[in-house]
Amino acid sequence: MATPTDERRDLLTVIAYLRAAPGKEDDLRAALESLVEPTRREAGYVNYDLHEDVEHPGTFFFYENWESAAHLDAHLTAPHLTRFAGVMGDLLDENGLTITRLRRIA
């Protein structure tokens, strides 16, 4: 029996991990929250969900799905993302950004 999401196996899934520099947790949270609404209006967006680690406040994850790599690439050059890139160095700790691209296999 097929699952309801089988037709979506071609999506590009991204998990972005971001950890705030000490004392910058609230600033990073606000900056990340400001990315959600404009991203959800982008072409190729499927979902763009921001989470915070309940055991490690100030550690955030975006769980994203995109129609294609081209849509993700366009997202990464969108004005709201380039503005964030300009300030993220002040908000993240030294190991504070990891982006993982995934493809669904089952």
Q: For each predicted feature, which ranges?
A:
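Generic hydrophobic alpha-helical membrane-segment signal
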Residues: 5, 32-37, 52, 68
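Intrinsically disordered, low-complexity sequence elements enriched in Ser/Thr/Gly/Pro
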Residues: 6, 17, 27, 73, ...
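An amphipathic, aromatic/His-enriched active-site/gating alpha helix that lines ligand/cofactor pockets
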Residues: 37-46, 65-98
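Glycine-rich beta-strand-turn "strand-cap" elements at beta-sheet edges
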Residues: 1-12, 50-56, 86-106
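N-terminal first-folded block
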Residues: 8-41, 46
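Short, well-ordered beta-strand segments in beta-rich or mixed alpha/beta enzyme
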Residues: 12-19, 49-76
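Residues at secondary-structure transition points
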Residues: 3, 7, 19, 23, ...
